[in-house]
Amino acid sequence: MSPSLVTLNSLMYIIPILIAVAFLTLTERKILGYMQHRKGPNITGPHGLLQPIADGLKLFIKEPVRPLNASPTLLILSPLLAITAAMLIWAPIPMPYSLANLNLGLLSILAISGMAVNSILWAGWASNSKYALIGSLRAVAQTISYEVTLGIILLSTLVLTGGFTIQLLTITQKYTWLLTTSWPLTMMWFISTLAETNRAPFDLTEGESELVSGFNVEYAGGPFALFFLAEYANIITMNLLTCILFINPGPSQYPELFLANLIAKTTILCLSFLWIRASYPRFRYDQLMHLLWKQFLPMTMALCLLHASLSISISGLPPHP
């Protein structure tokens, strides 16, 4: 494949993701507005549809603030790493064909999402501000903690599937979703994705009343916009993964509808994220950690052992493709 074609393929992936992220922010503001008995953005363009474009332009033409004692290289590298990891994670995902057909597709997705934690840590340290550092440490502790349960839940589903490829998950769910056999894991996965993406009620990284906006307190303009884009891209990615793992459309009679089915289910899951934000108050930090280490972790480990022992005892391990 020629370099120009590779670039074109990458752009065909990245541009729709960025457009989806832009309109997810508008949808969030509209939904929160209607749930609070007020209108959301309705001035810029027809029914406020051009509001994300106006917000993006405003952020990117702002002058970036560079604190005097901050580390300038890391300060710029942190948002770049965040947005790069958020875009790179889409490579193994079939839409309907993947950009990189990897044998260990799901494992690579987990590894790339873990790499994004470094951007938060770098941002807090490079700002040379105690508020940013405390915010980044809290965010990193939360993200790393919930990645443990995400990894174990992923392992439990892969034991039933018999491989790490996303295509195999699609074939496995031809007759029934994994949601029907693993609904406790699905619920824990969904709650863990809320915590992993720093969404309400687990938005402790941006607790304005406690942390002065968290790890990105020294960021403004373009670098702040990159963090913002990465956060919302990760929300879409996690919901897409939830759909692939537990409610996969599968190879139905109409394979051409696979992508439309996947997008529709992902949209519903994204809307549920916004509904949860409008409905629930923020958890305390100790409640967040208690939920993971004392409830989710023992339950996921027990279910993982159950799935493995069940498959072995009835000789039901699927063959590797």
From Swiss-Prot:
Keyword Signal attributed: no
Keywords: Electron transport, Membrane, Mitochondrion, Mitochondrion inner membrane, NAD, Respiratory chain, Translocase, Transmembrane, Transmembrane helix, Transport, Ubiquinone
Top-level class of the enzyme under EC nomenclature: translocase
One GO-annotated biological process of the protein: aerobic respiration
One Pfam match: NADHdh
Location of the protein in the cell: Mitochondrion inner membrane
Regions crossing the membrane: 5-25, 74-94, 104-124, 151-171, 175-195, 227-247, 256-276, 296-316
GO MF assignments: NADH dehydrogenase (ubiquinone) activity
Similarity comment text for this entry: Belongs to the complex I subunit 1 family.
Function text: Core subunit of the mitochondrial membrane respiratory chain NADH dehydrogenase (Complex I) that is believed to belong to the minimal assembly required for catalysis. Complex I functions in the transfer of electrons from NADH to the respiratory chain. The immediate electron acceptor for the enzyme is believed to be ubiquinone.
Name of the protein this chain belongs to: NADH-ubiquinone oxidoreductase chain 1
Species: Varanus baritji (Black-spotted ridge-tailed monitor)
Gene: MT-ND1
